[in-house]
Amino acid sequence: MNYVYVAGGQQNQGVLDLAITRQTKNALHSLVGGLKQADFGLHTIEQVTADIRQFSKLNTVPVGGKILTDSGGYSFLRGDIGPSLIQMLIDCYAVYFESEYETYEYIFSLDMPYSEKYHGFNNKNDIYSANERSLKSAIGIIELNQVLQAKYYFVWHFKMASQFSMWNNLYKNLDLGRYVRNHAIGGMVGLKRATGIRYSPFTAMSFHVLNSYLNSSFVGKEFRLHFLGIYSPQDRFHVAFLEALFQEYLADISTVAMSYDSINPMQAARMNKKIPFFNLKDGILEVYNSVNEIPISIVHSIATSPEHVQVILEEIDRRNNGFRLQNAGSFGPFNVYSNLELDKFFEMLIKKYDLVSVMKRSTSPTGLISCIGKVLDDLSRDYPQVFTRSVQQSIQQTFERAWRWHNWFVNGRNPQVAEELMLTVINEIGFPNMIC
């Protein structure tokens, strides 16, 4: 499981960007900066393209990292772009997709799930047509340059029944199994807050994607799945588990690579004076109350230079004395480090407790939850700041739902059963239907 840093959100990040990419290697940079203007077009795409090249030159190339490009479709969802400009949006994306493939390692499909502003667009015909046009454009470019097949991620949407049906039909009707090697799951930003669910909502879609991969032209190629915009510890624990479980399924077929992106580590560091800091040392998770308490050796390992070390020490001194930081983002790289250490810890725990085998041995969700509950009891005693009551409940609810899909997967992968399970999941999530 890999975390992808979301770049480009703040101006003049400078050394902070490099301090982060030295850890993550990879960074996600969006085209949104060239698409939210009233007069957006090829000229504004040229500017954001130059920004991405410059970011890559300064922050990913020096560390042997990679750029992932987000399509900027969020501008459409938010209403910065109206339906009358869809073709211009598709054309701008196409120019970047076709011409900048040596700059980016991966790129996400241009998706238009609905519009928060232009409600007249939110009907099945218009949404399907817009996304069909976008995907047909991408397919045409891929056919001209087969290198792009390995770089292209198809973004799935699923939180409304009509939406999932459309994306499923797009995949089938456009024969995307011949073109799509990599998959991503979108629509999850703010989903828990909007619905009140505690469990991780992406289990069903992950199994659906895995099944699509096994019926595609790319069986045997690495199975890559990206989760857009997740950040909670319980969600990341589940991604780490799914990666291990799917690798077990595909042991004789291919490798599995899962990843996620989030702006949360940087935002949390800006907004909160006290957030726990984690460091995994010799298999033990060290927990500090805040970045102010961490050993100087960790400061040196994260900072990009002796000068940066001094800047950080001065910021820690300001924080300790109740003064305002000179740069609100100063501790962002430290929170990224902390979250990466927590991710490693989750992966270690999944192996230590052999949770994949626990899933495989369980003959019912009740038996599985009993076993998982015992593990979580131990972990909450040893690491109460990580495995809080809320996190434990979320993990248990998520594993219960994962068992249903595991049972489906190992017992024939019946398409009719999958459809029924998927509709049950969507109804359970309960996101308001916005599509007529």
Label each residue range with its predicted role.
Residues 1-147, 380, 384, 393-396, ...:
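Non-catalytic, usually N-terminal nucleic-acid engagement modules in DNA/RNA processing proteins
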Residues 1-32, 94, 212-223, 244-436:
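Alpha/beta catalytic cores of nucleotide-metabolism and tRNA/nucleoside-modifying enzymes
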Residues 3-5, 74, 93-96, 101-106, ...:
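Sequence-level detector for tyrosine residue identity
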Residues 21, 36, 44, 79-84, ...:
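Serine/threonine-rich low-complexity intrinsically disordered regions
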Residues 25, 36, 57, 66, ...:
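Context-gated lysine
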Residues 60-64, 146, 175-177, 249-254:
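Glycine-centered secondary-structure boundary/capping sites
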Residues 92-100, 134-146, 170-175, 209-218, ...:
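Hydrophobic, Leu/Ile/Phe/Ala-enriched alpha-helical segments that form helix-helix packing faces
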Residues 123-127, 151-244, 253-284:
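Glycine/Thr-rich beta-alpha phosphate-binding loop at enzyme active sites
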